[in-house]
From Swiss-Prot:
Gene3D superfamilies: Aldolase class I. The record marks S41, Y103 as: Part of a proton relay during catalysis. It catalyses: L-aspartate 4-semialdehyde + pyruvate = (2S,4S)-4-hydroxy-2,3,4,5-tetrahydrodipicolinate + H2O + H(+). Pathway: Amino-acid biosynthesis; L-lysine biosynthesis via DAP pathway; (S)-tetrahydrodipicolinate from L-aspartate: step 3/4. GO terms for biological process: diaminopimelate biosynthetic process; lysine biosynthetic process via diaminopimelate. The gene is dapA. Its EC number is 4.3.3.7. This is 4-hydroxy-tetrahydrodipicolinate synthase. Keywords: Amino-acid biosynthesis, Cytoplasm, Diaminopimelate biosynthesis, Lyase, Lysine biosynthesis, Schiff base.
């Protein structure tokens, strides 16, 4: 498994979860052989009530996917994180993505205690998540090194925005997943061996093939740069709606689709799909 898709949570016009669209999203990943990651920032986890997460997890579990299923753990307190993990691990899931706690900005020792406590209660593999732009603090490489030998420490997702941390994480001996679609070739050279992708929501097979070939392609870079112009998941939802993959592009407060200002470039981005497909195919033919 080289690609794990950070899946959107599709909504209806009344902002309730669109379960039919959710099935379509995860089935498309299953068809491509990509892992499924629910309840991350792309999935608007913080805008989902506990009962809604329960309903979505219950629903996806009934689909009996034949690809790995991961869940996000977004919490400000250790009690909240542990409560979610203890509940969710009763379902047929394959692991959790766990960032540093939100807002509190713990240091080296605080992070170590945070992850040690989570590893002590989890019965499923844990992927530590470095995302300082979301949490306010970077994951310390020393924390990763100290936890690397734990049997349930599966690896690190690195969304730190540079290759430096990726190199240090990889030197700890854990598997590193690149958390930035646009940085995959550079991160691969720095030790990453997989991609947690947003773009694969809309192009699952192309993302899989792009990661396998591991080379810089302008059409991919252009699309990633366009997605980064707006806060995630505004761009990916707009792109999926334009391709008729979901009926509604709406996001929940405090996000608003009215903040999406890049609609005039959608036609160019949609054209990137054919260009990317042709480039990937040309390598396969050679």
């Amino acid at each position: 498994m080289s690609v794990v898709t950070a899946c959107i949570t599709p909504f209806k016009a009344d902002l309730s979860i669109d379960f039919a669209a959710l099935e379509s999203v995860v089935r498309s990943q299953e068809h491509a052989g990509n892992g499924v990651f629910l309840f991350g920032s792309t999935g608007e986890s913080l805008s989902l009530a506990y009962e809604e997460k329960f309903a979505a997890l219950s629903f996806v579990s009934t689909l009996k996917l034949n690809v790995p299923l991961f869940l996000g753990v977004t919490a400000t307190s250790i009690q909240e994180a542990i409560s979610w993990i203890e509940f969710a691990q009763r379902w047929p899931i394959d692991g959790f993505f766990v960032p540093t706690p939100l807002y509190t900005k713990p240091g080296l020792y605080g992070q170590k205690v945070w992850f040690e406590k989570i590893l002590s209660v989890s019965k499923k593999p844990i992927i530590l998540y470095n995302n300082p732009s979301r949490t306010g603090v970077a994951l310390h490489p020393e924390v990763v090194k100290s936890l690397a030998s734990h049997p349930l420490c599966m690896g690190v997702k690195d969304s730190g925005g540079s290759t430096q941390a990726c190199t240090l994480f990889a030197e700890s001996g854990v598997r590193v997943f690149c958390g930035d679609d646009g940085m995959w070739p550079e991160m691969r050279l720095s030790g990453a061996s997989g991609l947690v992708s947003v773009l694969s929501n809309v192009w699952p097979e192309l993302a899989r093939d792009y990661v396998a070939q591991c080379r810089s392609i302008d059409a991919w870079k252009k699309t990633c740069s366009w997605l980064e112009l707006s806060v995630n998941p505004l761009g990916i939802k707009a792109l999926m709606a334009a391709q008729k993959m979901i009926e509604c592009e709406l996001v929940r407060p405090p996000l608003s689709i009215r903040d999406f200002q890049e609609r005039d470039q959608l036609a160019d981005i949609l054209a990137c799909r054919a260009i990317l497909q042709a480039e990937l195919l040309s390598v396969c033919v050679q």
